Regions:
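Bilobed "Venus flytrap"/periplasmic-binding protein-like clamshell domains
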Residues: 38-47, 57-71, 124-170, 186, ...
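Extracytoplasmic small-molecule ligand-binding "clamshell" domains
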Residues: 25-101
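Short helix-initiation/N-cap motifs at beta->coil->alpha
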Residues: 77-88, 167-177, 181, 214
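Bacterial N-terminal signal peptides
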Residues: 8-19
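Periplasmic-binding protein-like
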Residues: 43, 119-127, 195-235, 255-263
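A ligand-binding cleft/hinge motif common to bilobed small-molecule-binding domains
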Residues: 85, 101-110, 155-158, 180-212
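Ligand-binding clefts/hinges and TM-proximal coupling segments of bilobed small-molecule sensing domains
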Residues: 27, 151-168, 202-207, 235-263
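Extended ligand-binding regions for polar small-molecule ligands
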Residues: 62-71, 137, 142-143, 149-151, ...
Length: 263
């Protein structure tokens, strides 16, 4: 029996046991029968997802999406999204999954379901090495850039002093560019994005302090437990040391998935 057969059998069996008699037409089976899966990936958030020099999508999330499609035995359609629109694309049926460095929080959990974590990630405040900031209190009087609708946006809004100015951008590229060009004093963003900027512009994206640990999860519509179950099997099967997810994480993120908590 192939890996795809094993993963499919486990998930379908679990879903059927819990399903109502009228609910046998589940999403996992629908995807397999259609032969196509549409997955949202970031277009502006390296190393998770961006457009390469050849014009093609590349990054950790892109390769995870390819691995999902391969194990399901279906054709992959990648759909480029930004942080503000990725959940809307899922809820309106434009995509089947969101693999876009998506952090989980109670507010998002009201409208979508999450798998176990598939990538390490933390959110922080970053800025020029010459800017002295060690805590939220030090943000007073500073201008901080952040991508609208992200978890770091919510955390920054909660923690920033009243005298801080929060400048919001519609996606990640302008947020990073604002720091690189000096339009803002600091940015709130993910560790991977800040690392990408630091490699291009040494000294521009020094970590000041951590806002919160926020591992990435795959987003799925609610009431699709069969698909969530299959994806969790997929994640745990491939994240073990030497597994394909672990290898991708080391390639793109420079980190192993060993010890990654499920949530």
């Amino acid at each position: 029996m192939s890996l795809k057969d094993i993963l499919t059998l486990i998930a379908v069996t679990a879903a059927l046991v819990a399903a109502e008699p009228s609910a046998f037409a589940d999403k996992l089976e629908e995807i397999i029968q259609s032969g196509v899966i549409k997955i949202a990936v970031p277009a502006d958030f390296p190393p998770f997802g961006s457009v390469g020099k050849d014009g093609q999508a590349e990054g950790y999330d892109v390769e995870v999406a390819k691995l999902v499609a391969r194990d399901l035995g279906v054709k992959l359609e990648l759909v480029a999204v930004t942080s503000p629109n990725r959940i809307a694309y899922l809820l309106t049926g434009k995509v089947d999954l969101v693999i876009s460095s998506l952090g989980a929080n109670p507010e998002r959990a009201k409208v979508i379901a999450f798998t176990d974590a598939y990538a390490p990630f933390y959110l922080g405040i970053f800025g020029d090495a010459k800017t002295e900031v060690k805590s939220a209190a030090d943000l007073a009087g500073k201008t901080i850039g952040v991508t609208r609708g992200t978890i770091e946006d919510a955390e920054l809004t909660r923690l920033a002093p009243k005298t801080a100015t929060i400048q919001r951008f519609e996606d990640n590229d302008p947020t990073l560019s604002a720091l690189a060009s000096g339009k803002v004093d600091l940015i709130a963003t993910g560790s991977a994005a800040a690392g990408s900027l630091a490699r291009k512009s040494p000294g521009k994206a020094e970590k000041k302090f951590v806002l919160r640990d926020s591992p990435a999860h795959i987003g799925v519509r609610k009431d699709e437990p069969d698909l969530v179950a299959w994806l969790n099997v997929f994640i745990h099967y491939h994240q073990k040391p030497g597994g394909e997810l672990d290898a991708l994480a080391q390639k793109w993120l420079g980190e192993s998935l060993a010890g990654l908590p499920p949530f």
